[in-house]
């Protein structure tokens, strides 16, 4: 799945969803796969995770860099999602 996608869309879910999300974030962050859109749909669901990433991983622990925050986008805007996916670059890895 990870190597054939041209964008990654995640909807609210459980441990499996979080596992897949962090696997893709890690692969992109470490340059093992091309950077492609990672879209988290459902702002109310994803906001606490986003706050944890910003406050704990970035600010308190320093285990990620500020540029890592640009690896994903959180939105509920369907038109924006369609536009991002339509304009996603083709894979080159």
Language-model features: locations:
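A charged, well-structured terminal subsegment
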Residues: 3, 64-93
